Amino acid sequence: MFGKLLTKVFGSRNDRTLKGLQKVVNKINALEADYEKLTDEQLKAKTAEFRERLAAGASLDSIMAEAFATVREASKRVFEMRHFDVQLLGGMVLDSNRIAEMRTGEGKTLTATLPAYLNALTGKGVHVITVNDYLARRDAENNRPLFEFLGLTVGINVAGLGQQDKKDAYNADITYGTNNEFGFDYLRDNMAFSPQERVQRPLHYALIDEVDSILIDEARTPLIISGAAEDSSELYIKINTLIPNLIRQDKEDSEEYVGEGDYTIDEKAKQVHFTERGQEKVENLLIERGMLAEGDSLYSAANISLLHHVNAALRAHTLFERDVDYIVQDGEVIIVDEHTGRTMPGRRWSEGLHQAVEAKEGVRIQNENQTLASITFQNYFRLYEKLAGMTGTADTEAFEFQHIYGLDTVVVPTNRPMVRKDMADLVYLTANEKYQAIIKDIKDCRERGQPVLVGTVSIEQSELLARLMVKEKIPHQVLNAKFHEKEAEIVAQAGRTGAVTIATNMAGRGTDIVLGGNWNMEIDALENPTPEQKAKIKADWQLRHDAVVAAGGLHILGTERHESRRIDNQLRGRAGRQGDAGSSRFYLSMEDSLMRIFASDRVSGMMKKLGMEEGEAIEHPWVSRAIENAQRKVEARNFDIRKQLLEFDDVANDQRQVVYAQRNELMDAESIADTIQNIQDDVISAVIDQYIPPQSVEELWDVPGLEQRLHQEFMLKLPIQEWLDKEDDLHEESLRERIITSWSDAYKAKEEMVGASVLRQFEKAVMLQTLDGLWKEHLAAMDHLRQGIHLRGYAQKNPKQEYKRESFELFQQLLNTLKHDVISVLSKVQVQAQSDVEEMEARRREEDAKIQRDYQHAAAEALVGGSDEDDAIAAHTPMIRDGDKVGRNDPCPCGSGRKYKQCHGKLS
């Protein structure tokens, strides 16, 4: 009460914000007379003038009033449309990292031209984001004449464009497109092979239309690029046949011992290594089978992939034993947990090992559908330097916009007072009674000539109503959720006299319903219309418009309450645009999902006690309040889920940004020789530490093991034991330096042989290829971690903290493995000439082209996995009760294991 009193005296925060912005509106209005006197050329020259001032150090705020006045004047000349003062207010809100709530019909598309023009003057690009391709194309084409008049370029970014078309779209001053396409382009850019393949510029300013739909409704669905590599089962099968020809050797070759085997096994490290004899034998076998060219080496740059396959097959045969490490069940290889002995269905080994085991066992080889890249909309849009959005319904979600995106919501007043009548809900006992009442209301409206828009929550419900209308011989149009051009036409004509249109709640969003029908569309349908034809169409429309207004304007009829108040408000907002007449009413029944879950038996019991007969409805503010409270509960639950998703994804997002930044630096750098030098010191030192622990006595050193490891992994054949025997003063630190220097000398010799430029290019190619491969494996490991993390709760641990800790360990592992693998490959692989590097790049591109990429929205639940909040979420999950009444102390039918009163009964 005290808060309401303060608001009355000082005004709300929204009022104070608008009051501050009104001063700038007054400035823009004061400039209007002067700008009207400018010629077209003088008005167009304003763009160059503003750009010069910005280059000289002026701020966008300092030129805002003049820039907005320029756009308003240009719009009057190009479109014969003048921005209202409220649209100027909306434009200023959108320029200041806020969300503008503007009612339906207030001209959001025209409002967006103001901040889009202002921010495009910086030359950094503006992205105007819509919910579908149709709206992106429509808005871009509608506004193109205005922007081009002012000397700006417009691009359209939709699915299916070629790389150059994408680049052109992004290089435009203002780019229209869908949220999905912008997100996927970001992911694709971070999978590019060269800087020339990237299409996006740095993310500067995003202006999101229908911001609630994109940042809230779709926030839980991450964008994922996944792909199954080409079907390489034939390759696994062929390589599998080579392994039985190979002979095991008990110990590594040395000066004292030269074995006759083909490979050795390091059981401790679970690794196998070819002997020189074995390498030659495998190469000969591959040449015999036509898998390797005559004279080619398995260790040449172009054959890295083949080498991986051979190693995987050898490991499958020698290190992994059936009924110990895995079992074969129903034609599938299932991993056995080495610690618990339990099977782990659904889990697969990486690096091609699982497929190699499948080939060994003769079962069907499955291609993994691997996540190549992923991001949530929440984290994608937070990458922009500036972010703003507009919608007709944001105020109910203002807290979420502020909490997650740091965006304040400002409710922009309507240009004309709202006169729509929002009538109280009518609640019936059964769905059948409700539908009969809806049909009666539609018939009454048709008799008066009043158009009706019937909003349903599902396609199934819209089809049911359509069948009832056919039965009653009521002419109507049905729209489902699939948006296409025809739908826009139907929605545009839904305001004609006596028209009846059934639409799912979201269908047709973005198209205004004009009372009397859309006369512009009628004119557009004619080829070269004469002024007389235009005048007749407009006169006919005026008669229809007046008749519809006299009948009460557009009547919105809701057939069920949505679980979100915002969606209900969107439906209501289709009527009463620009001060038009209109009305709205929701028809509900006790069988509706929301009522059945939340309103409980008490309400229907009360309705029966009131002696309500069939067909009678209850209409009371108390019922409307109860429904609103139910909706608040659902909204709160959904907010918790989105917040939880973000907390989990933030961990992955930090890692994603580190990897992508590193990748971009790699691609843009001319040489990464210094990086290679630094990591080789780290890698060799780490290997030495395993065999010669720092500051340890010589008795603890495993010198033969170190010699063997350096030879196997880095092709360094060093007589370390001999050095130690001959030089008494050779201590740990000087030995370390000598080994590192030996690697550097060997690498320099390789550089002199192949040439510095070839090796620099090869280093980049190896580093990128290794990083990409490990990142894909890391994403899979993160998925597995996320799916099982909620089980940590049973051990009295906080799943979120455990997820952060374990994912950090996985990331550290990724970085260490990256360093090790890059140095190992650079040590082993033989590069003869530039053509080897080019061949390696060509193979890599070929393999990438074979990936059947799948651009998809993942289920949010898969991204979250489980958590300590799972039970709380489960307790709020809508449940349909279709059996006997559940007692308060009975187990809840949802399966949570709790008593009904402590679970879904809480909501009754």
Curated annotation (Swiss-Prot):
GO BP annotations, alphabetical order: intracellular protein transmembrane transport; protein import; protein targeting; protein transport by the Sec complex
GO cellular component, one term: cytoplasm
Membrane topology label: Peripheral membrane protein
Stretches the record annotates as Disordered: 866-908
Source superkingdom: Bacteria
SMART domains reported for this sequence: SecA_DEAD (SM00957), SecA_PP_bind (SM00958)
Biased composition (Basic residues): 898-908
Stored InterPro entries: Helicase_ATP-bd, Helicase_C-like, P-loop_NTPase, SEC_C_motif, SecA, SecA_CS, SecA_DEAD, SecA_motor_DEAD
GO terms for MF: ATP binding; metal ion binding; protein-exporting ATPase activity
Compartments (UniProt record): Cell inner membrane; Cytoplasm
Record keywords: ATP-binding, Cell inner membrane, Cell membrane, Cytoplasm, Membrane, Metal-binding, Nucleotide-binding, Protein transport, Translocase, Translocation, Transport, Zinc
Binding site for ATP: 87, 105-109, 512
Bias kind Basic and acidic residues: ranges: 879-888
EC number(s) on file: 7.4.2.8
Catalytic activity as recorded in UniProt: ATP + H2O + cellular proteinSide 1 = ADP + phosphate + cellular proteinSide 2
Record has Zinc as a keyword: yes
Cofactor binding note: May bind 1 zinc ion per subunit.
Record-linked Pfam families: P-loop_SecA, SEC-C, SecA_DEAD, SecA_PP_bind, SecA_SW
Needed co-factor(s): Zn(2+)
Residues that, per the record, bind Zn(2+): 892, 894, 903-904
HAMAP family: SecA (MF_01382)
Subunit details: Monomer and homodimer. Part of the essential Sec protein translocation apparatus which comprises SecA, SecYEG and auxiliary proteins SecDF-YajC and YidC.
The protein's name in its UniProt record: Protein translocase subunit SecA
Name of the encoding gene: secA
